From Swiss-Prot:
Disruption phenotype: Cells lacking this gene display maltose 1-phosphate (M1P) accumulation and trehalose sensitivity. These phenotypes are suppressed in mutants lacking both glgE and treS or both glgE and mak. The active site is at D416, E469. This is 1,4-alpha-glucan branching enzyme GlgB. Pfam families: Alpha-amylase, Alpha-amylase_C, CBM_48, GlgB_N. Pathway: Glycan biosynthesis; glycogen biosynthesis. Belongs to the glycosyl hydrolase 13 family. GlgB subfamily. Its EC number is 2.4.1.18.
Amino acid sequence: MTRSSNQLTDAHLRPDPSDIHRLLAGEHHDPHSVLGAHEYPGHTVIRAFRPHAVKVTAVIGGERHVMQHLESGLFAVAVPFTNLIDYRLEIDYPGVGDAVVTHTTADAYRFLPTLGELDLHLFAEGRHERLWEILGAHRRTFTTADGPVSGVSFAVWAPNAKGVSLIGEFNHWGGNDAPMRVLGSSGVWELFWPGFPPDGLYKFRVHGADGSVTDRADPMAFATEVPPHTASRVTESTYEWHDEDWMTRRASLNPVFEPMSTLEVHLLSWRPGLTYRQLATELTEYVVEQGFTHVEMLPVAEHPFGGSWGYQVTSYYAPTSRLGTPDDFRYLVDALHQAGIGVIVDWVPAHFPKDAWALGRFDGTALYEHSDPRRGEQLDWGTYVFDFGRPEVRNFLVANALYWLQEFHIDGLRVDAVASMLYLDYSRPEGGWTPNQYGGRENLEAVQFLQEMNATVHKVAPGIVTVAEESTSWPGVTRPTNLGGLGFSMKWNMGWMNDTLAYISRDPIYRSYHHHEMTFSMLYAYSENYVLPISHDEVVHGKGTLWSRMPGGDHEKAAGLRSLLAYQWAHPGKQLLFMGQEFGQRAEWSEERGLDWYQLDEQSFSTGVQNLVRDLNAIYRSRPALWSRDTSPEGYSWIDANDSANNVLSFLRFGNDGSMLACVINFAGSEHSQYRLGLPHAGTWREVLNTDADIYNGSGIGNYGAVEATDEPWHGRPASAVMVLPPLSMLWFEPA
């Protein structure tokens, strides 16, 4: 800093009138060119925009220079220095009565941008894999001549906005007194605000291209207010992970060839009132006790409407604050990992809600959504559809997937509503959609996005799983991207689910006429890598529950449910079961109340179903025949697929280790007391599972723990055994 001997002049105090007009209107693209310190020959002019201040003083070293109020909160002073390195602003605000409240701060408009050219270039090309590190709100400390300056830097993408200002508790949510600057042609607006509270609330006041002025939550917010409040919150993780063993093991395995038995959970209603940290104890203990390998959480990203179950996301980078902080959510994931449980979260890149404070028409234009409503709106759900062809939007979503996998150690993403992304005419009337460049109905931009997302996450986070909820016959959903597929690890088998639930809902006396519904799935079982889903979608909106779908009285319902679950666990594919169904909840699920845990208060049919699921998981995990060849035809062989007269199905499962299981299920309401089953060889076959056993509150009918196979050929097999098949039951056997 150099003191000048030149005569000071007020000639440069007042900026150009157009600058003042745009500044006051909140529509200045570069407020830093007006505010802050600006050097002229022999002196420096410092300007500050503090509309609520009664006095502003520039403090330089030990000198105080009172600033002149020009107009409407714009203050300026000329000081006799050049090469000015540092200064502070002393701002007087009116207090109670005649009191004055003085606030001293570094000047926000003297700091250089916090984003580099490379970051902006990568973002513009849609290739910044750690986008959350440059956009959003970040605590920072800068070293200055007058000491360290701590605050928060803010950056938001709004390329068509006329102006963007930071608002929050720090300025009483008002005005345009914290205008941000746009960085070149990037469309990114940026500002570092000294002294911003480390957990402060904020929004962006966006002056849109359409003349609108809206207060917006940060699209990259890492934390939010608790809904229904909508502000974003500054946060910074201090969490120390303790799941190193899990993460190392994860990176070395391919989940397609590992056991996967998943409990799908809606965290807010599993046991209402629990926080993330309380769930870390109670949910973890329960899942371990029941023997599941994974938990799949309905969307945890922040959403304003609880009735959406999390599927209408407004803050893609923030775990819902209803249950705690982001670090509390990390604690939950960590606890599950330390207990040996994988964590999958539902992820919703297909669409987003139209709330005026969120992503929709963010800068007064269709920014995140497609500009053509025939592609940019999802009519069924009243939501916007992302513009998958826009590089910055694609980057926002791909980086978001990486964010959950890397910052929260999530093990997998279940991608919601993939079919709605793949087809331009999805749920649209004739004339209500536009074809692709080749005249087809395929959304080629969405295909490219899904391929890029899958290729990127599997490269960056080896061992994770991506699962598609895709309800059509789109080819190659789980085929690698280098072979033209979408690149998902697995896909929900919606056909199996629909056929199976239709079949088991029928009275046993009619099932023989629909036998094909239970065999059809094996015709395509190896066309994709499948998950067998009995999800939340099957226990809402009047569909009832698995229990209520079963025909008959309570005894028959319990037996039917037990046999269904055993059939699911024995069928090729990974398992997914929505919470409550593992103990036969009778009431349909609602997000507004908890599960009916009272059904387990005494020995009951529910206790029996729960005991069965625990044993299914234990047997499943310990028998490679049930999972190691899920994607290979060599892992399965029918014994008899055609015994419709008896409502019986039987098959063999084979493991990579040479193990095998013989599985036979009786869907009839009556016992088959002398049923002969073909087997690969003679000898003793141990009864590994009988869903009608006493421990499951069944009737106790069985084969005393084993059957003896003789060399009498049957079902095209060289040996066979005669056994008892209880009504509505499934039996598993293995060589003794």
